[in-house]
Amino acid sequence: MTFARRLRDAFIATLSLTCLHGALVSAHAQEPHKAQIDALRKAMEKYKDYKVAVRDLYLSTVGCVHYSGEKIPGSMEYAKGAMGVHFVNLTIKGPPDPMKPNVLIYEPVGRDLKLVAVEWLVPLTADTKEVPSLFGQRFMGPMEGHEPLIPKEFHHYDLHAWIFKDNPLGMFAPTNPKVNCKGSFALLESPTKMVHGPHQ
């Protein structure tokens, strides 16, 4: 075997081991987030019944929010799709808790509501020094409140997690093209305006 061939084989072997190590490290890094997501999903199971959510002070904003995919300079970019009907719990405060989202999101299905996602809203304050994060995901924002359901003066960050409905745009995308907002309570929103503050 020539020296050049031995060198080539050694390089390939080293590269293979490096890639394998990287894959193992990456898989290990993702495991805690998967475990957290599984725990979150289990904790949220009871809220598949929206009446239980209401009893726990998650109150409906009624409108089924969806977006056209319109892009407006200086505003958030939302892919065409829907979020759904938001149930907001104003009693949950403080730093975002991965097991206690302060928003539950439901999709109208016939005469019922199906829990599809959860969301964390974090107010932007004078003390905010960095973008909040959960599950290795940085929150979107800061942005104004989502009018007309939330006053525009409520500047905040948010993060969605589609834990009960597959989202082709990704688990943490804000909109989901598979969610339908039809009927009397469909609410087409314009992209939310971004505001000054620590960004992604």
Identify the role of each PLM range.
Residues Q30-Q200:
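Primary mode marks residue(s) on the alpha4-beta5-alpha5 output face of response regulator receiver
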